[in-house]
Amino acid sequence: QGLISFPRV
C-alpha cells in the first residue's frame, strides 16, 4: 500500500 497507515492501539 502506498498510503501511510498509522497503527491503531
UniProtKB/Swiss-Prot annotation:
The keyword Metal-binding does not apply. This is Periviscerokinin-1. Keywords: Amidation, Neuropeptide, Pyrrolidone carboxylic acid, Secreted. Coiled coil: none annotated. The modification Pyrrolidone carboxylic acid is found at residue 1. The modification Valine amide is found at residue 9. One of its GO terms (cellular component) is extracellular region. GO terms for biological process: neuropeptide signaling pathway. It is found in: Secreted. Mediates visceral muscle contractile activity (myotropic activity). Belongs to the periviscerokinin family. InterPro entries: Periviscerokinin.
